[in-house]
Amino acid sequence: MKLNKLAIATLVSAALSQYAFAQTDTKGTIYLTFDDGPINASIDVINVLNQEEVKATFYFNAWHLDGIGDENEDRALEALKLALDSGHIVANHSYDHMVHNCVEEFGPNSAAECNATGDHQINSYQDPAYDASMFAENLSVLEKYLPNITSYPNYKANEFARLPYTNGWRVTKDFKADGLCATSDDLKPWEPGYSCDTANPSNSVKAAIAVQNILANNGYQTHGWDVDWAPENWGIAMPANSLTEAEPFLGYVDSALNTCAPTTINPINSKAQEFPCGTPLHADKVIVLTHEFLFEDGKRGMGATQNLPKLAKFIQLAKQAGYVFDTMDNYTPNWQVGNNYSAGDYVLHLGTVYQAVTSHTAQQDWAPSPTSSLWTNADPATNWTQNVSYKQGDVVTYQGLRYLVNVPHVSQADWTPNSQNTLFTAL
């Protein structure tokens, strides 16, 4: 009997050791993100993901539910439900993909009219307040078609967003970036004669930056991408939708891991030029951008026939290579009781990002909060708020006015910008 117990203990110990090795041997985390659904093609994409036991993040535009997105979208509601019921993350990509700025008068045929011109990335953003309101409109329409949508824990469209066209980031106070050549005021970014001055970006880009700041002040995190899985043969005859093969695309992911990929990605309109290279939250992570319409047989090519098998194969190869997959709500790790935190670590708690002030082991009554001495608020918002570690040179907004931070400090309730001339200068 003693021998049996010893044998069992040995086996258990070996199994645990192998498990621990497997846990520490992870190569990196891949975040599969899909833009511009829900459309009919979303269903097949989700089925492949489910078959491969991988969760993804879908940045949805609700105009497809209204049937005005100029896609194969009569099953859009079915796709939305399937994504939610399967546990995938549903995030916000605006109601109409900013097409209201592409045509003179937005209406049911606007998507087709914009597609006919191809001018999506000219004057894409014009009025920051109105453009930002399209994210709130997206929520309203999603909830109209699925009234119980907010009961899904994986419905995150009121917390996580991605701007159309632009590789933009608002993750923490010090983890921000914008696509400074993403859109233009005159020429498409790939047309002859186009030039981009990152020191003085287009009015459209400036408006997009303002939209990102509005979203951040409304509690959103926005994420761009490290790698774009797109056709390498746009513009040729069928099957023009053919994506990069799974093996070389995994090589692209390998090349992006632990590099400053958003600054080197091509083409120029896909870059995030001022991405904070080396930021710790970016370590060991690769965000893959792709689009559901690339996975259907239709007007653009043979996407389902060509690309659905590539998606499955890529997932299989990535797992074999040591990658794991996760969703964007876990990009910034959630605060957990019992975790050991080092000074400088970031967590997400109740919709707010915090940074650890001192090293400690989290306890139930030590949760991050506006009054915590263990954590400071590290949200990407520009609005002044309490318990933020402000640096000299930071610019904040308070009661509609902008202020420059003169002295580094952690904000307190009675140190508002309008009452502390030594800490702030009005702009």
Swiss-Prot record:
It is an enzyme of class 3 (hydrolase). Keywords: Carbohydrate metabolism, Chitin degradation, Hydrolase, Polysaccharide degradation, Repeat, Signal. One of its GO terms (cellular component) is extracellular region. Belongs to the polysaccharide deacetylase family. Carbohydrate-binding module 12 subfamily. It comes from the Bacteria. Residues 28-326 form the NodB homology domain. It catalyses: N,N'-diacetylchitobiose + H2O = N-acetyl-beta-D-glucosaminyl-(1->4)-D-glucosamine + acetate. One of its GO terms (biological process) is polysaccharide catabolic process. Specifically catalyzes the degradation of N,N'-diacetylchitobiose. Key enzyme in the chitin catabolic cascade. Residues 333-375, 382-419 form the Chitin-binding type-3 domain. Disulfide bonds: none annotated. The gene is deaA. Residues 1-22 form the signal peptide. This is Chitin disaccharide deacetylase. Its EC number is 3.5.1.105. Pathway: Glycan degradation; chitin degradation. GO terms for molecular function: carbohydrate binding; chitin deacetylase activity; chitin disaccharide deacetylase activity; hydrolase activity, hydrolyzing O-glycosyl compounds. InterPro entries: CBM5/12, CBM_sf_5/12, Glyco_hydro/deAcase_b/a-brl, NODB_dom, Polysacc_deacetylase_ArnD.
